[in-house]
Amino acid sequence: QLKKEVTRLSKVLHRDITQSRQHFLKLTLPETYRNLIDLDITDDYTMGFASQIGFRASICTPFNFYDLDTELETKLKIHPFAMMEGTLKYNMKVNPEDAMKKIQPLIDEVKKVDGGFMSLWHNDTLNNRKIWLGWKTVYENMVQYASPDKN
């Protein structure tokens, strides 16, 4: 099924598909990554928690997937993220006014090790409609705080 979807998307876009993020962050290790490798996917953005914030891979820089069963480092680059906006809102019940209190410590940890802060935001989050009112400002504040010129 995945091969069929990647092939179809490639035809529609007239280009190779090399990046992936699993919907709902559904990740079965190592099978999901092996399937992506078989489809020539080079980068995956699924590595993160759905129900909490933090560093699921204990690292904030991209790394190549190491297959423990085969004892091989693969060419699949994993790009871990530290937080998802839906986790703050739905799982942690954080409102927009308090969201930066949760996000800033993550960014501070990343800056300490000169890493890369990656977060996951959905496009409808930034529309400022009733259900997501205030979250666009959180996103803007997060980007500003994470900028290299901020300490």
Protein language model regions, located:
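Active-site-adjacent pocket scaffolds in enzyme catalytic domains
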Residues: 1, 7-110
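C-terminal domain-boundary segment and adjacent tail
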Residues: 10, 97-151
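Generic recognition of short, well-ordered alpha-helical segments
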Residues: 4, 31-34, 130-137
